[in-house]
C-alpha cells in the first residue's frame, strides 16, 4: 500500500487537455442565477413601479442570498476542479491508496462520471483492465464519449472500457472483478436503499477481491454503517473498515462540510 501511495503522488490528471468537468453541474448555476436575476428585477419593480417597500425588501434579501449562494458554490466547484484546488483528485488518491491489490485482473468503477477515477486506476496498475459504468443522466455534463476521449489523452484507452450501467442492477455475473471502486455515486441514486446498493456492487467482486467504496454516508440515508460493516464481517468479508475520508482527503471535517461532503466515508475490505 505504501508503494501504491507513492504512485498516487506521481500521477497528475488533466495535464493533456482532458475535460473531467465537475459534479457541480452547469444547470445548477443557470437555475440559481436565473432566479437571482428574477428576484432582482422584482425588487426593482416593487420599489420603483409598484411602490410596495415590503415586497422590495423581501426580493432584495432573496437576491442577496442567491448571490452569496452562487459565490459559495462557485468556490466549491473551483476547489474540486482538476484545474483548480484539485480536492477531488486528492479524494481519488485516498481511495486507491487503501486498496491492497497486486495490479492483475479487472477493476470495476461504479459511477465513473467523466472517467477520472477509472483512468487513475489504469495509470496506477498498468497490467489491469478497468471498466467504468455510469447512467450518464442529463443533469451532469458527462458521457461515454467524454470518458473515452479522456482515456485516450491519458494514454490508457486500450485498457479502459466505458459502458452504460445502473448501480441498482449491475449487468455483470457474480464474482466478475478483482477490485470494485466507487466515489460519491450511491447517494445520487434516488429512492434506493444505500446498503443494498453496496451489496450489489460487492456481488460482482471475486472471492479474495478488494473494494473501496466512498460516499457521503449520512446516517439518514445510509443507516448504521458500523453495523453494516459488522454484517459484512459476519458474511465472511475480511479487513472491513470505515475510513474517515472527510478527515483524510479534505484535511478537516469542517472543510469537508463547507464543500457539502461532511459525512464522507470510505468502506474498505476484502471479500
Stretches with model-predicted labels:
Residues 195-207:
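A short glycine-rich, Lys/Arg-flanked "PGG" loop and its adjoining helix->strand segment in the class I
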Residues 20-29, 70-91:
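Class I SAM-dependent methyltransferase Rossmann-like catalytic core
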Residues 168-180:
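A short acidic, Gly/Pro-enriched loop at the edge of an enzyme's catalytic core
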Residues 125, 189-191, 205-207:
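Helix-to-beta-strand junctions that scaffold the AdoMet/dcAdoMet cofactor pocket
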Residues 114-126:
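Conserved SAM-binding loop of SAM-dependent methyltransferases across substrates and taxa
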Residues 208-215:
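Conserved beta-strand signature within the Rossmann-like core of class I S-adenosyl-L-methionine
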Residues 103-113, 131:
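Conserved class I S-adenosyl-L-methionine
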Amino acid at each position: 500500500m505504501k508503494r501504491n501511495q507513492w504512485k498516487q503522488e506521481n500521477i497528475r490528471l488533466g495535464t493533456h487537455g482532458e475535460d473531467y468537468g465537475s459534479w457541480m453541474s452547469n444547470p445548477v448555476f443557470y437555475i440559481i442565477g436565473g432566479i437571482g436575476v428574477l428576484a432582482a428585477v422584482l425588487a426593482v419593480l416593487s420599489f420603483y413601479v409598484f411602490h410596495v417597500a415590503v415586497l422590495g425588501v423581501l426580493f432584495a434579501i432573496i437576491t442577496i442570498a442567491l448571490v452569496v449562494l452562487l459565490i459559495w458554490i462557485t468556490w466549491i466547484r473551483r476547489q474540486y476542479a482538476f484545474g483548480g484546488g484539485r480536492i477531488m483528485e486528492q479524494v481519488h488518491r485516498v481511495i486507491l491508496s487503501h486498496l491492497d491489490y497486486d495490479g492483475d485482473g479487472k477493476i470495476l468503477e461504479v459511477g465513473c462520471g467523466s472517467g477520472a477515477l477509472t483512468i487513475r486506476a489504469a495509470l496506477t496498475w498498468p497490467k489491469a483492465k478497468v471498466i467504468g459504468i455510469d447512467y450518464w443522466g442529463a443533469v451532469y455534463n458527462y458521457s461515454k464519449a467524454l470518458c473515452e476521449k479522456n482515456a485516450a489523452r491519458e494514454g490508457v484507452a486500450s485498457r479502459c472500457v466505458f459502458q452504460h450501467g445502473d448501480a441498482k442492477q449491475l449487468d455483470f455475473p457474480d464474482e466478475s472483478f478483482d477490485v470494485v471502486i466507487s466515489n460519491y455515486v450511491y447517494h445520487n441514486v434516488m429512492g434506493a436503499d444505500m446498503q443494498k446498493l453496496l451489496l450489489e456492487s460487492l456481488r460482482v467482486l471475486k472471492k479474495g477481491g478488494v473494494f473501496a467504496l466512498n460516499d457521503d454516508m449520512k446516517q439518514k440515508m445510509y443507516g448504521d454503517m458500523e453495523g453494516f460493516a459488522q454484517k459484512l464481517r459476519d458474511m465472511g468479508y475480511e479487513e472491513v473498515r470505515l475510513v474517515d475520508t472527510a478527515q483524510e482527503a479534505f484535511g478537516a471535517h469542517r472543510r469537508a462540510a463547507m464543500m457539502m461532503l461532511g459525512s464522507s466515508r470510505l468502506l474498505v475490505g476484502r471479500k
